[in-house]
């Protein structure tokens, strides 16, 4: 039966297990294996300068554009653990390599969870044993997607069917969402026959306009990793544009799922900025609004408080005419020429989706959209209790 995630494309199998890393006792380790005949790989990692040990190892191993497997654990980030953390990440890869008969450099590794605690290597080793046991690997994409969850409330999968080839994906991440990815792990698989250069181009283009425009709370994780693995098992060689479109579609779907499942979310908010000189300025302005706590609180309260939008965007590094800014909530003008529009306070924001559009009045062609959420009581409750 066709799967909806990473095992939908030909040439991929997966497994999942409960190793006891999560205090909840829920599944917490997963394995994705590319059975070939090709082993093309590309990745995008966090831009946080404090990077977790698995990111260091994966960055080295994917540099040649080839990977045959990726190991995941949830419940422990293996970040900020010094040389011991690095050694544990490498030990995990070495142990898996022995079990699968692969070279260690053919394996990627990802961790997510609490920062600053050493990996329980006895549990990791036992988990690898279970992941590679006879009969464990198969069409288990859904189980793998569930095993990588942390504060997610639902697993996240998608599939894109192209002309004779497929892209599948799984992801996790609902908090610490900000540019340069998020607390986010994503694995995309495809049975298309592509080169490493094609994979890198498609992944960079897709993440730039999907995951990197998702900004939930302004925090950037130490562990962000997005992998694209290609088996070539379909025998189809798409063009670069065809690959770009399919990878974008998969990433966009996952990004929307992450926004919908964001920690404590009650409102899904899009912030679009126009009327400035460059796209870079527009995205800076949109992010400045999206990160502003007063704005986010107004969204939680369904309050069409356009003044908070102006106060926030005025801090952005973007060209603007401060006397001629326009703000629209759900396509209704609430502020024109930087003053309130008639009926602004009566705009209905009670729905779950809110579209905010801001014209900075500088007359340029720059534009960008950032997706965010409101700031609710539940968000504070979830994150104040996270380490416990």
From Swiss-Prot:
Protein residues bound to substrate: 150, 172, 183, 263, 383, 388
Keyword Magnesium: no
Positions of the record's site feature: Involved in the stabilization of negative charge on the oxyanion by the formation of the oxyanion hole: 112-113
GO molecular function, one term: glutamate N-acetyltransferase activity
Site features described as Cleavage, chain residue numbers: 182-183
EC number: 2.3.1.35, 2.3.1.1
Family to which this protein belongs: Belongs to the ArgJ family.
Protein name per UniProt: Arginine biosynthesis bifunctional protein ArgJ
Gene: argJ
């Amino acid at each position: 039966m066709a799967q909806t995630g990473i095992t939908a494309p030909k040439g991929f199998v997966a497994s999942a297990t409960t190793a006891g890393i999560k205090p909840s006792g829920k599944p917490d380790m997963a394995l994705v294996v590319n059975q070939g005949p090709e082993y093309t790989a590309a990745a995008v990692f966090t831009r946080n300068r404090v990077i977790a040990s698995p990111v260091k190892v994966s960055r080295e191993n994917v540099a040649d554009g080839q990977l045959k497997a990726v190991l995941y654990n949830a419940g422990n980030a293996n970040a900020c653990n010094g040389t011991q953390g690095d050694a544990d990440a490498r030990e995990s890869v070495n142990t898996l390599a022995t079990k699968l008969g692969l070279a260690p450099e053919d394996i990627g590794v990802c961790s997510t969870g609490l920062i600053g605690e050493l990996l329980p290597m006895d549990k990791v080793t036992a988990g690898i044993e279970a992941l590679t046991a006879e009969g464990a690997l198969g069409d288990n994409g859904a189980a793998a997607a569930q095993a990588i969850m942390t504060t997610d409330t639902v697993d996240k999968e998608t599939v894109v069917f192209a002309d004779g080839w497929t892209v599948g994906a799984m992801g996790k991440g609902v908090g610490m969402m900000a540019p340069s990815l998020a607390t986010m792990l994503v694995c995309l698989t495809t049975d298309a026959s592509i080169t490493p250069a094609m994979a890198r181009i498609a992944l960079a283009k897709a993440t730039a306009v999907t995951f990197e425009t998702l900004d939930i709370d302004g925090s950037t994780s130490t562990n962000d990793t997005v992998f694209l693995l290609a088996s070539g098992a379909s025998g189809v060689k798409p063009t670069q544009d065809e690959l770009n479109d399919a990878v974008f579609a998969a990433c966009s779907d996952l990004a929307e799922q992450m926004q919908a499942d964001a920690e404590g979310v009650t409102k899904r908010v899009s912030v679009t900025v126009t009327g400035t000189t460059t796209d870079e300025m527009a995205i800076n302005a949109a992010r400045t609004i999206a990160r502003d706590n007063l704005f986010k609180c107004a969204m939680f309260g369904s309050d069409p408080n356009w003044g908070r939008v102006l106060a926030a965007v005025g801090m952005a590094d973007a060209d603007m005419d401060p006397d001629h800014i326009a703000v629209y909530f759900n396509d209704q003008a609430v502020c024109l020429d930087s003053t309130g529009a008639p009926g602004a306070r009566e705009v209905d924001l009670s729905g779950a989706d809110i579209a905010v559009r801001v014209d900075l009045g500088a007359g340029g062609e720059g534009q960008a959209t950032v997706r965010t959420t409101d700031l609710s009581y539940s968000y504070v409750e979830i994150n104040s209790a996270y380490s416990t």
